[in-house]
Amino acid sequence: MYCVQCEQTMVTPMGNGCSFGQGMCGKTAETSDLQDLLIACLHSLSAWALKAREHGIINHDADNFAPRAFFATLTNVNFDSNRIVGYAQQAIIYRNELIKAISEVEPNPELNHPLAYIELKGISIDQLAEQAKEFALDTDRAEIGEEVHGVRLLALYGLKGAAAYLEHAYVLGKFDNDLYVEYHGFMAWLGTKPRDLNELLEKSLAIGSMNFKVMAMLDAGETETFGNPVPATVNIRPVKGKCILISGHDLKDLKELLEQTEGKGINVYTHGEMLPAHGYPELKKYKHLVGNYGSGWQNQQKEFARFPGAIVMTSNCLIDPNVGDYADRIFTCNIVGWPGVVHLEKHNFAPVIEKALECDGFPYTELEHYITVGFGRKTLIDASDAVIDLVKAGKLSHVFVIGGCDGDKEERHYYTDLAYALPKDTAVLTLGCGKYRFNKLDFGTIDGGLPRLLDAGQCNDTYSAIMLAVTLSQKLGIGLNELPLSIVLSWFEQKAIIVLLTLLALGVKNVYSGPSKPAFLNDNVMNLLHEKFGLSGLTTPEQDFGHIINK
């Protein structure tokens, strides 16, 4: 096992990365290795998908499958070895279908790619786990050096994050052939194990540029399907009655669940990154969508254990449900998986509803406590003139974008301390589950109007923050980096990595990121990123605030 992709990975004097029987996330060495094998198969599939396009051959099923299966290898998504093997087998099936289709117009096609003809050596988990060792991500690390190895992983992990957003968009009916060509190009290239550091950096930024278009496509899918988010208050206290909790990012799953539970006397609660759903008109109209439950994903073992109903995981982040003894009432769907947990197919939530009706539900309604969400792209852009007026009047001095992923580390209290200590003439724009570090605090308003805390949505809604910045830049006639706006990211996994690459690709400088540096990037690479982009780690809220304001 060698896995170094998330912020909680092991960091020791002997080396970085999880490399024993189980990762810090709970993923077994077997599953981790099989994910490496799956990725190798996906490199092969992408290489042939590009070859097929040379002949005008497009297999949309293969295109859709490729990023979805890659998504399954993100942190806290799929821990089920059998499912991972199934994805690898399907990747080879699609690859062979492409070869067959190409053969009809180009007899005996050849492809110069190291993984072009990879085959699975067996069908058993043991056989494939043994084969998987050939494709560990650190096989040539000693030969190529830490810098090249690290930036190659930066590109790979960034592409994983983009793959997740491609899948989220596809679920909402959004597909762009040109973006899939770009995706396959990057995936096939990474399968060649590139070694040129400058090329790796350039391609990493190119992946970020691609992801900006992916996020725009996802934004269109969400707003066309559910309407533009509008500011809305959300109750974060339990309501008496039977209940279902839904977590993850897939708003379509939530819509299906709400439709199937309507009139059944079951209250539905969002969790984690589902919180922004309460701002979408086509979701908030359901009266039995009663509120949001819990906090960041890392607290789910305690919070899910206390939740007296059924639980649905639609995407990351899932952790071991056996610890809190709720494995019999948690369900997975889409690319999520845990061994022994019931997996739902085709949006059939009947087992979830049945389990919810069996459970006790909340015995009484607690005193309501509301927070506000719904500051999506349109709302933010519509408010841009008001923001400019406040800046010109000296009533708004700075906007801080504070968000990203949450996690376990004690150091993450930094984000709470920073947000709470900011002067009253500043505003905080937040997104992702990092918001749970401070979104229950009362930040008040500026000049009695603009809320000081603006929840823009999920991690992919970084797009909304970017579009606000672009709008302000255009209206003020200044560059993005001249705006009184600073970004402080909290990273944990690969979606945060692609968000960072997207910002860097757009030319955004002086981003702060933490709570710690990625374990796959050494100090030389971090210094390079600081020199080129002004990327900085975190110190203390007071010191970083001083640096930001005085720049």
UniProtKB/Swiss-Prot annotation:
Positions of hybrid [4Fe-2O-2S] cluster binding: 249, 273, 317, 405, 433, 459, 493, 495
EC class of the enzyme, as a word: oxidoreductase
Top-level lineage group: Bacteria
Keyword Cytoplasm recorded: yes
Gene Ontology process terms (BP): response to hydrogen peroxide
E.C. number(s) listed in UniProt: 1.7.99.1
Cofactor, how bound (note): Binds 1 [2Fe-2S] cluster.
Stored Pfam families: Prismane
Subcellular location: Cytoplasm
GO molecular function, one term: 2 iron, 2 sulfur cluster binding
Modified residues (Cysteine persulfide): 405
Key words of the record: 2Fe-2S, Cytoplasm, Iron, Iron-sulfur, Metal-binding, Oxidoreductase
Positions annotated to bind [2Fe-2S] cluster: 3, 6, 18, 25
InterPro entries noted in UniProt: HCP/CODH (IPR004137), Hydroxylam_reduct (IPR010048), Prismane-like_a/b-sand (IPR016099), Prismane-like_sf (IPR011254), Prismane_a-bundle (IPR016100)
Cofactor: [2Fe-2S] cluster; hybrid [4Fe-2O-2S] cluster
Catalytic activity: A + NH4(+) + H2O = hydroxylamine + AH2 + H(+)
GO cellular component, as recorded: cytoplasm
Family, per entry: Belongs to the HCP family.
Primary role: Catalyzes the reduction of hydroxylamine to form NH(3) and H(2)O.
Protein name (Swiss-Prot/TrEMBL): Hydroxylamine reductase
